[in-house]
Amino acid sequence: MALGSENHSVFNDDEESSSAFNGPSVIRRNARERNRVKQVNNGFSQLRQHIPAAVIADLSNGRRGIGPGANKKLSKVSTLKMAVEYIRRLQKVLHENDQQKQKQLHLQQQHLHFQQQQQHQHLYAWHQELQLQSPTGSTSSCNSISSYCKPATSTIPGATPPNNFHTKLEASFEDYRNNSCSSGTEDEDILDYISLWQDDL
């Protein structure tokens, strides 16, 4: 009788210890662990989907059955290695693209600088041409003509030309100086006026 009661007490102690081991805190901890493992597996699954098949085939050394749609999926370590390699290749493409853009920008700047130099040269040549064709030369020619005309009137002492003719001569000569004294035909006209005036004397 005492032995049976002792065995019953031992069985009850085992149940109490088992229930204590499977308590609510342990159950919650196990649930959190299962959820964490599930999230990690889902993350690796999504990461495998973003790795191009060409990168997987290149890094798997041509082994069959590996990659998207294959029977054998990538391990976590292989997935991380291929993701790192894929990121490295993307960085290389971006770097080459930036270099190409910088090269094109440099060529555009050189072309713009060349165009500005050409425009500056054209403007300088046009300015030089304008200086050669400026009214300064015609003014000096008018002054030389007027200096040439004045001695002609003073070479004949005591000569007194008619007033009307002298007025016409001054008006014609003034019009010649103001408008187009650089014309060769009007140079001949003024000389004809002088010759005519000398003949009348």
Swiss-Prot record:
Q: Where is this region: Disordered?
A: 1-32
- What's one GO MF term for it? DNA binding
State the UniProt keywords alphabetically: Developmental protein, Differentiation, DNA-binding, Neurogenesis
Does NAD show up as a keyword for this record? Answer: no
Spell out the Pfam families in the cross-references: HLH
**What tissues has this protein been observed in?**
L(1)SC, SC and AC strongly label the presumptive stomatogastric nervous system, while ASE is more prominent in the presumptive procephalic lobe.
The subunit structure is:
Efficient DNA binding requires dimerization with another bHLH protein.
Q: What does this protein do?
A: AS-C proteins are involved in the determination of the neuronal precursors in the peripheral nervous system and the central nervous system.
Name this protein carries in UniProt: Achaete-scute complex protein T5
Species source reads Drosophila melanogaster (Fruit fly)
Give the organism's phylogenetic lineage: Eukaryota, Metazoa, Ecdysozoa, Arthropoda, Hexapoda
Gene that this polypeptide is encoded by: ac
